Amino acid sequence: MPGNPLPDAEQLLKALTDQMRPEVGPETGLIGIHTGGAWIAERLHRDLKLKVPLGTLDVSFYRDDYEKIGLHRDVKTSSIPFEIEGRHLVLVDDVLYTGRTIRAAMNELFDYGRPASIRLAALVDRGGRELPVAARFVGATITLAANQNIELIRDSNGRLELVASKD
């Protein structure tokens, strides 16, 4: 996007880690939303030295708008290899936009049990909420037009990068 370069994803990840470190204990459950959120969660899990195994969610079947926005049911496996009942959780996503992905993720989480709390970490908050969802931990807040999209990609070396496109 000319005149509005996207922030460096690696720097945002470091900022996110620094925000989370004082508030996230080793017994906190960390769950990444496929695909970009899972990549971020992998790095956060390692850097925060969490003891609880990393969890991942694919919310494809829990979304209420997949037909409207053209989501393909390229389903990945959801895996939560720990008990969530009564546990403090951090749900991780790459880009927070309408809030619908987060709503879907919370619906799926409650199928696994009743956590003590759920906090949200997002690499980027781009505004545009349709549901009352807010992240506790945010790498950066940016403003994009409704016809602009932002996506997290990962190269073969594991380096993360934000890329923009238009509808």
Task: Enumerate the language-model features and the residues they cover.
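PRPP-associated nucleotide enzymes
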Residues: 1-167
